[in-house]
Amino acid sequence: MSRPHGIPLPSAHRSSDDSTESMSACDDDEQGQPRPREGARQPTEAERVRTLVENNASVSLTLPGARDHGPGYWEPAARTVTPEGDVVLLVPWDSPTARAAACAQDDGPSCVMEITDVAPVAVRQRIRGRARLAGRLTAVRDDERARYERLLAERHPGHSPAYAEADRPAWMLVRLETDEVSVDDLWGAGRAAPAAVGAAEPDPVARHEAELLQHLHTAHGDQVRGLADLLGERGAAAGPAVREVVREVVREVVPLALDRFGLRLRCTAEGGRTFDVRFDFPEPVNGTGELRYAMHTLFAAAAG
């Protein structure tokens, strides 16, 4: 069985807090997050945005004149993407978002939804990416309600616009008609057409990623470290920037991200230098069963 090789991810930029530097073994990017090399299998911008919208990343909504009532007061309880690329949100009925949508005339007020993706395992530079969707906020018409409720139920079973308890408000469906979509994350920075986001599928691993990464970190730390130990083999044939880093003793290895294409680790060397490395699966996985087999194969190959 061939041994997997990690892909040290390139970036010539060091952040002002000196927290993360990545190795220039592949295509250099003058600044920003570590990027995969040209030609590597990776999700499109639209797929990455769709994944962020429909999973557990933190969301904030910006509306003209809306007051901030504190964290969690009017965050959407659930959200999904329509085939047209709009975003349907389930929000508290007494929230600024619901009031703005209910009072909307014609095109509705401008609205910006910002999504922040935070690593579920504690690492330096914990924010993994951000997405921004800008457009107009409108109420969901009565003749559209059943359709959007079905879309939400498919992605978020158990959430219902009619749900209410004594200590929490009832919910309202609103829609963000998107005009502009952008993303900046571990894969790169770019834009996506709303229609492309509507046609994309979220990453099948994303829904379980947080618990899987936490499990890898707490229960399989030695195996994760075994993958990082392969960096020495990679560095021997790489450029001087890679060799400079892999010569240092890696003192900490943390699983940073997991998707259908592979596993990304964040490594911290003895001198405090931090860099990322990816281990790609032989083929993209389509669910937890295939993921379990891919991870077993990866660890077995690393063990020799």
Protein language model regions, located:
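Short, structured beta-strand-loop surface elements
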Residues: 93-157, 271-275
